[in-house]
Amino acid sequence: QLPSIFSHYTTPKGGFILHQYLFFIGSFPVRAYGLLFMLGIISSGLTAYYIMKRDGRGWHVHIFDFTMYCGLAGIVGGRLWDVFFFDWAYYQHHLTEIPYVWQGGMAIQGGLLFGAIAGILYTKHYHIDTWAFGDLLAPAIILGQSIGRMANLMNGDAFGHPTGGNFGIVYPETTLAYQTYSSQPLWPAEVWEGQIDVLVFVVLLFYSSFPHKKGQVFSLYVMLYAIERFFLEFLRGDYVNLTMGLKSAQMTSVIAFVIAFVVFLYLQFKGTTDTEDKAQA
């Protein structure tokens, strides 16, 4: 019998527990993490395709290749970021496990950085306006991130620290969350991040419907996600390494916000509106 995605468990309030494995093909496990992670990439690509087709500049024909290249770069970047910035204490003794991305352990910030680099190189190669392309892409990216956080939930990583009460998420014994905090209820940090990502998605679509300078939608996306991630890190319990009193993800968020804010203001005064460029095209 194949395991269901959810099964009941007993707590003071009742609830459900999450399965890392959806089913097995022979001895090969099909992980909920990998399935949802790929679903996030596919959903992001389809959303970008729809937005760009409506835009009318023909950029939608690039989405398949663009998603493939940026998705692969994002996987590499997300894995390396997690290994070297979050879990090096473990991986320095288990080097052969670094390529095992299907087991979980991906840092969104590293994935976004490597994906952005790949995206810039792609747009430059095909002579596509990078800022305008990024503005159209931003809502699709944050939507994919939201689904990615559900992958973290199913895998029991990117978890919160104990709530101190009888409310929260209790993870299965096979997860890192359980190995770290046992059966203590934990803050649903990854769930809330996924939900806030959806709100950011709506905000970006709303903002992009009004006249704006090229690059401002993407800059706004970076600022909003940086704010979101900075504060949610106070609830995260999967790592505690601090630099100047802040976690590494918070330091990265501060840097990303400052850069995006400066770029946003610069574009406001020195940039050109996307509608002007479309009219000239």
Question: Model-flagged regions — what are they?
Answer:
Residues 3-281:
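A feature for loop-to-transmembrane-helix boundaries and adjacent hydrophobic helices
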